[in-house]
UniProtKB/Swiss-Prot annotation:
One of its GO terms (cellular component) is cytoplasm. InterPro entries: RNAP_P/RPABC4, RPABC4/Spt4, Rpo12. It catalyses: RNA(n) + a ribonucleoside 5'-triphosphate = RNA(n+1) + diphosphate. Belongs to the archaeal Rpo12/eukaryotic RPC10 RNA polymerase subunit family. It is found in: Cytoplasm. It is an enzyme of class 2 (transferase). SUPFAM superfamilies: RNA polymerase subunits. This is DNA-directed RNA polymerase subunit Rpo12.
Amino acid sequence: MGYKCTRCKQKVEIDYEYTGIRCPYCGHRILVKERPTTIKRIKAE
């Protein structure tokens, strides 16, 4: 699952074995999870 940096807008892969979560490009700590591009269809009853 990919994340996106809120400062530089780069796609970031998270290494969960490393203790700190930061953008490797700019060092910013706020990352948002990218949403999937597919649309989920649910049938209404």
